[in-house]
Amino acid sequence: NSHGMFLKNKLKDEVSRPGIALYGYVNDDKINLDNTINLYAPILQIRYPNIGETVGYDAIYKITKKTKLGVLGVGYADGLKRCINKRKKLKVGEFSIPIVGRVSMDTIVVDLSLIPNKLLDEINHIPLIDNKYSIKNMAKDCSTIPYEIMTSFGKRLKKVYIK
């Protein structure tokens, strides 16, 4: 397995398969591997809700000030764990953008108020998993393991393989 590959001389004349290490993960904080999986969500819509409106399931987020919201095209039907709400903020360059409301079946909503419109015109996707927030981070936030996160991604997600 992946962990056995890093035992070096302890497995002399043995064969080991990489397993999850192929994707940049191993259950040992002393072993640093590069992240190989990124997840980007397309910005489907930008909305300017009225003060007092609510967002998401159970109306858990209430608009209290002038706000620019982005509706992102990924949800729990795609395998995105609902516990990503614990993360609270995504990053776009130097900007932190809060997740508002709950992850829904097909979308999540983020507060884009701090992002200049010029930058929004240049981007069409928001990173959810990348080098700054890896699957390992998401697994920790969701009290699970990276295997569960990776195997939950659904068929609706477009996969791009880079050589």
Predicted features along the sequence, with ranges:
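Active-site anion/phosphate-binding pocket segments in diverse small-molecule metabolic enzymes
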Residues: 2-163
